[in-house]
Amino acid sequence: MKTEVNGSAPALAGDHGGVDQDTPDAGDRTEQAKHKTNGATENAPKSANAKDPSRPRRKKARRACFACQRAHLTCGDERPCQRCIKRGLQDACHDGVRKKAKYLHDAPDGALMPGVGGNFYNNAMRNNMPLSRNGTTTVNTTTQQNSGSNYYPTPQSNSYNVYQDTPLTQNSFPSQSPVSPTFNMKTTPTARSNSLSSSVNQQPPSTTVSGATQSQNPFAGPFFDPSDPALFNFDLSSMNFENRYGALEFGMLGHMATGAGDSPTDSATQRGSIGRSGSTQYSTTPLTGAPGFGESPGNQQPFLFGNDPLLNEWPNSQAPNQGHLNVSGVYPQGGMMHMAKSDAPHAFAIESGPASFSSPSATTSPHINSGHDESSLSNAAVNKSTGLTANGQRPAITTPSLKHQSLQFGVKRRQRNPSTVYESVKEPYAYTNRFHNLTAFIQRRFSPQKTLQIAKALASIRPSFIATTKTLNRDDLIFMEKCFQRTLWEYEDFINACGTPTIVCRRTGEIAAVGKEFSILTGWKKDVLLGKEPNLNVNTGGSSAPGSGNTSRGSFTPRSSTLETATPGRPQPVFLAELLDDDSVVEFYEDFARLAFGDSRGSVMTTCKLLKYKTKEDMELAQSDDNQRWNNHLRKGGIAGEAGMNQLGFKDGKVECAYCWTVKRDVFDIPMLIVMNVFLPCI
């Protein structure tokens, strides 16, 4: 048994040795793997080191494509980029969209792309519109609906095709492009009417209204596109802006500013009078013979707002033989009756031209045609402008515009020229004599105690007056008066526009300007306050008579010839002290002493008691029993209208008010005038 075991051992060892000869061990496999790896590494090119300064730098793209932007990878300027070409996305490679700033949130994405210039606007719809021989425009309905969704979709409504089928020559209406609002209308009206008279005679006037089943208006939806720079003739390439949207906004502001003060002339209407129907823009209507483009505002079609009924269907004032045709019924008869009143507030006109910011008169506001005859002048002017005969009739669809003939009947505003101020002032104002008159009035009206209080207040600012006026000569004083009159010229418009009682005084307290509301509240007429009529007021607020005439304050007051007129009925401006009661006058001059040479922007808000204007007859009437019953009725019923305001304080002659006033200085830093407004009665 042992011999067999030992004999089999070499055999097993020999078998194992055979296996080792055929199969390599683990060490041999590791060496072979290292050899193959080193061989592959030696054959492959070395990768560029990111920190190597000599490596070629890739050019930074101005804007990455959408795919590279999503993947946060470096892109190139070429389209399609190399990365999209490798991935097979060259057909979908386009510029990515950056996050817009807040002030550009409403801008279209394409408008913010740099370098697009004026090529962003898509003129595909405009270029694909063939013009027929009769001047109308034919558009594919499908194309219109698809392109219209990009802008402002407007509700569909009936289109009114008023045009002629007779072909027009090309040189009759030369223009830059079908959508450009600038049209060269240099033909005279006589020549234009002669060239179109044959077509008008050959074809009878007809107005066709197409329903929903008929072809819709091709310019209903996308006709008004504010992103088109050609619409306002903007040259965006000449504007130094980084993006197109900013240049378009700047150009629009400039376009609005240049036409803000223009009148609705023919040139103004030619710049922006593209109407609702495209067929009427390139031809002359056979009903009137009047051109549909670039003529007077009365003949204009609605402005660039497509078929919007709220903006285009406003009926306008027409001749009595012209009937209104309210298309969409925006103004029913029940809702328009209040607008036909002559005292209705004037609204800004939506004129055909973009430069009209005028307010039309009440006769040009939307109203119902009453059918009665207007003046013959109005009929002649309308017929002349529209080309109609005396008995011609036609339905009219227009927008409210400022007719030329309506300027003759509207409220005329007087022309004011500030140059008259400098021409009229030849002498300096006599402030010294006016202060003497004020001193005499204070001594005559107030008690010695209150006169002393007012004198102390004026004495506190007397050194400042002397210091500021000692170097002024005659020319300076004349210039000072011109400054006062020029400032007062500006305040007149402010007083007329302000709805609260307002007065303007000189530094002496003399009334220089007054508003209508102040006269209604106090009963003081404007001419009396300004010294144009005699002052017959006897109401002093129940102030006590002055003391003995031998007071020390009257000894040094100069007596000049001007004081002789300081009697009831004197023709000179009223002092502010005559409009207030005793306590209010003392309080005013104490505040004036603090504010005259103090804060130049300061103001005073306090209460006072205004004195009503009362003659001797008014004082007797105030004591009657009838007036007592009227005051009781007024106290129960309240205040209604101007009559109620006039009755405020009619019994005791005082109206308690809250008011605000300030001091305005001239170029020499001297108090020039006192502006007092917001006299609100305490009811």
Swiss-Prot record:
PROSITE patterns according to UniProt: ZN2_CY6_FUNGAL_2
Pfam families, sorted: PAS_13
Record bears the keyword S-adenosyl-L-methionine: no
Subcellular location, record wording: Nucleus
Compositional bias of kind Low complexity: 134-150, 352-366
GO cellular component: nucleus
DNA-binding residues: 65-93
Predominant subcellular localization, coarse grouping: nucleus
Biased composition (Polar residues): 151-218, 264-287, 314-325, 376-408, 537-565
Entry's Gene Ontology BP terms: cellular response to starvation; gluconeogenesis
UniProt region (Disordered), positions on chain: 1-58, 131-224, 261-328, 351-418, 537-569
A Gene Ontology molecular function term of the record: RNA polymerase II transcription regulatory region sequence-specific DNA binding
Domain of life, source organism: Eukaryota
UniProt cross-references to InterPro entries, sorted A to Z: ERT1_acuK_gluconeogen_tf, PAS_13, Zn2-C6_fun-type_DNA-bd_sf, Zn2Cys6_DnaBD
Alphabetized UniProt keyword annotations: Activator, DNA-binding, Gluconeogenesis, Metal-binding, Nucleus, Transcription, Transcription regulation, Zinc
Record function comment: Transcription factor which regulates nonfermentable carbon utilization. Activator of gluconeogenetic genes.
Family: Belongs to the ERT1/acuK family.
Protein name: Transcription activator of gluconeogenesis acuK
